[in-house]
Amino acid sequence: MTELQKLEAGLEYCFFDEEVAQRKTNAVIKCKQLNAIAPDDFKEQSRAIKDLLGSVKGEAYINAGFYCDCGKNIHIGRDFVANFNVTILDIAPVHIGDYCMIGPNTLITTVGHPLRASGRRKHLAQAKPINIGDDVWIGGNCVILPGVNIGNNVVIAAGAVVTKDVPDNTLVAGIPAKKIRELEE
């Protein structure tokens, strides 16, 4: 089994593998191009976003400072907004629903590393997909960890670290993020 096959099967894989690294190199180049586009050139931004990401359902606005691992594993819905300095480490798929907003300096990461030092010395990682529903607002300086599913109509308060699934119609905050209250539909 190749390292790429291990990655896609959700198993531990070596992140220095050539095939895995090549995906990242392509994304780094495309992110650099996207971030260099003039902020008022919406047509060119739209073209670059659609070239970088796996799928874009409708309009998407991504501010400068956007970075991702692969790009093609990110699938976004209608009217997507990412503020400044958003990073999505999409070694595994990231699905983001319609009408979602991501605040500045936020990290969405599908990849983690072993707790065992011996595994980290071998450059091992494991990727788990992330799913984000419709009408989600992720505040600034948040972290969404691997394998998390976020429901519809959810607000993630600024600075939260989301380690577990979040049900529909919920406001969460804190480190780790905990339910504060239910939201009206």
Q: How should these model regions be labeled?
A:
Residues 39, 66-76, 81-150, 170, ...:
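Flexible, glycine/small-residue-enriched loop-and-beta-strand segment within the central core
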Residues 159:
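Rossmann-like dinucleotide/phosphate-binding beta-alpha-beta segment
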Residues 1-59, 177-180:
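Terminal amphipathic alpha-helical/low-complexity segments used for targeting or macromolecular assembly
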Residues 4-5, 52, 122, 129, ...:
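Short secondary-structure boundary/capping segments
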Residues 149, 163-164:
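Active-site/ligand-binding-proximal alpha/beta "capping" segment
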